[in-house]
């Protein structure tokens, strides 16, 4: 066989293989329509779980999207009436809308702020030190959204040194 014939046969096989591969490749899915992406959840259908049964007994969370333990999320959080958290920080910023109850936050060294239903707060992450509590008259429910996983780092207070 001449070199030109071998070249033509090889080229024909390559083209034929490419055509067969195109026909057998799975078709790309069309993007979902807006109606197919719609999510609606009744309040009674929320899946409330314990946020941290050991460190925050009674505090519940219901993820709406994402996963609060792994990364970006949107969720409802419920604090029991009278619940309080000592001085602490969070790694990530949180945007919060209060749904019910009276939420109380005291930035370190400043007076407490009481926020009721309909109030909004953008709480910075990083070194923003504050206490958090819920008024004892009723549970506090709020919506929180963050670009990172939820965490709570209690600030260790310096203990006085005792002289021997």
Question: Residue locations for each model-derived region?
Answer:
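Bacterial N-terminal signal peptides that target proteins for export
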Residues: 1-9
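Conserved short histidine dyad/triad with adjacent acidic residue
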Residues: 73-90, 122-127
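A short, N-terminal "cap"/entry segment at the start of jelly-roll beta-barrel domains
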Residues: 22-73, 157-164
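Ligand-binding loop in jelly-roll beta-barrel domains
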Residues: 125-150
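Short beta-strand His + acidic residue motifs that chelate non-heme Fe in jelly-roll/DSBH
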Residues: 85-87, 104-106, 129-136
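Glycine- and acidic-residue-biased ligand/ion/polar-headgroup-sensing regions
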Residues: 80-83, 90-109
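Bacterial N-terminal signal peptides
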Residues: 8-18
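Short acidic-glycine-tyrosine-enriched beta hairpin
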Residues: 69, 108-127
């Amino acid at each position: 066989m001449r070199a030109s014939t071998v070249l033509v046969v090889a080229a024909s096989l390559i083209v034929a293989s490419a055509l067969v591969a195109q026909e057998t490749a799975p078709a790309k899915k069309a993007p979902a329509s807006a109606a197919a992406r719609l999510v609606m959840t009744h309040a009674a259908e929320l899946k409330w779980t314990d946020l941290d049964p050991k460190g925050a007994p009674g505090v519940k969370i219901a993820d709406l999207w994402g996963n609060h333990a792994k990364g970006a999320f949107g969720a409802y959080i419920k604090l029991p009436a009278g619940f309080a958290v000592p001085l602490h920080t969070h790694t990530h910023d949180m945007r919060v809308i209060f749904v019910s109850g009276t939420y109380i936050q005291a930035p370190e060294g400043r007076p407490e702020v009481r926020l009721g239903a309909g109030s909004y707060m953008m709480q910075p992450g990083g070194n923003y030190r504050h206490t958090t509590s819920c008024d004892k008259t009723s549970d506090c429910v709020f919506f929180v959204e963050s670009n990172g996983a939820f965490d709570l780092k209690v600030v260790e207070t310096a203990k006085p040194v005792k002289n021997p």
